From Swiss-Prot:
Recorded metabolic or biological pathway in which this protein acts: Cell wall biogenesis; peptidoglycan recycling
Protein source organism: Yersinia pseudotuberculosis serotype IB (strain PB1/+)
Name the record gives this protein: N-acetyl-D-glucosamine kinase
InterPro entries tied to this protein: ATPase_NBD, N-acetyl-D-glucosamine_kinase, ROK, ROK_cs
EC number: 2.7.1.59
Entry keyword annotation includes Metal-binding: yes
Keywords for the protein's UniProt record, in alphabetical order: ATP-binding, Carbohydrate metabolism, Kinase, Metal-binding, Nucleotide-binding, Transferase, Zinc
Length: 304
């Protein structure tokens, strides 16, 4: 059995998956914001409850909104202050008497998609999240590529490419980013960036859902905005595809529901790839909100 915890700022969700990778049980509880011993106790209690339900000890994986530190075993997770800077993996492993694996929740999203029955046929899967920010994960032969600092999937912190400046104008503001730099692509091609770009060019603020509705109705400003956005998205993704060369790209996050992305990217991407490059398959994510739990559970699958 595979147990996956999705640990967020307000809730902890546990999903239990059987040997056929089907979810058979789940439970959700509030996240203790400040009390680390209480957090450990909740994770222990949920694990033992799952053991009782299954009649066996399952493997345990945890997805966090942050990064594990490979050097000292602590976690950096600002959204869960109770776990910030704590050796969560070692402490929980000791409590439940089994190995615990921890990874970034965006990596868990990518892993969940890569273990889809159909998507498993692709050796290299790029999970791309276009949500409040931009992130994701790279999966090779069913395993997460974490990198030295667990930041392989921090795609949103590439800077705007030169070709994007040709589209947006050389004087486009280099938007300050939460990472401390300016001009990171997540401030332009995320859901938030989609809205910012519209506001910048038209001095009018609208939520993404309204912009997309205006686009569907043929409103000229919205149409021009979507065309511009798709061009910038293709430029940025073209750089990413040239670097990583995946067989499959799976798109998640709020903007993944904008179906125009899957129509336009295959048309626009070739201009930004090497001539010998073949386009990867580009698909919408299949597991939605359950992807974090599912991917966390599957952190133990690569060894099979």
């Amino acid at each position: 059995m595979y147990y996956g915890f999705d640990m967020g700022g307000t809730k902890i969700e546990l999903g239990v998956f059987d040997e056929n990778l089907q979810r058979i049980w789940h439970k959700r509880v509030p996240t203790p914001r400040e009390d680390y011993p209480q957090l450990l106790q909740i994770l222990r209690d949920l694990t033992e409850e799952a053991d009782t339900y299954c009649g066996v000890q399952g493997s345990v994986g945890i997805g966090i909104p942050g990064l594990p530190n490979a050097d000292d075993g602590t976690v950096f997770t600002a959204n869960v202050p109770s776990a910030m800077g704590q050796p969560l993996q070692a402490d929980l492993s000791r409590l439940i008497q089994r190995e615990v694996r921890i990874d970034n929740d965006a990596n868990c999203f990518a892993l969940s998609e890569a273990w889809d029955p159909e998507f498993r046929t692709y050796p290299t899967v790029l999970g791309l999240i276009l949500g409040t920010g931009v992130g994701g994960g790279l999966i090779v032969n069913g395993s997460i590529v974490s990198g030295r600092n667990h930041i392989t999937g921090e795609f949103g912190h590439f800077r705007l490419p030169v070709d994007a400046l040709d589209i947006l104008g050389a004087d486009i503001p280099r938007v300050p980013c939460g990472c401390g730099h300016r001009g990171c692509i997540e401030n332009y091609i995320s859901g938030r960036g989609f809205e910012w770009m519209y506001s910048h060019f038209y001095q009018h603020t609208l939520p993404a859902t309204d912009i997309i509705a205006h686009y569907a109705a043929g409103e000229p400003k919205a149409v021009a905005h979507v065309e511009r956005f798709m061009d910038v998205l293709a430029v940025c993704l073209g750089n990413l595809l040239t670097m990583l060369d995946p067989h499959l790209v799976v798109v998640g996050g709020g903007l993944s529901n904008f179906e125009k992305i899957y129509q336009e990217l295959p048309k626009r991407l070739p201009a930004h790839l090497l001539r010998v490059a073949r386009l990867p398959r580009i698909e919408k994510a299949r597991y939605g909100d359950s992807g974090g739990v599912r991917g966390a559970a599957f952190l133990h699958l690569a060894e099979k």
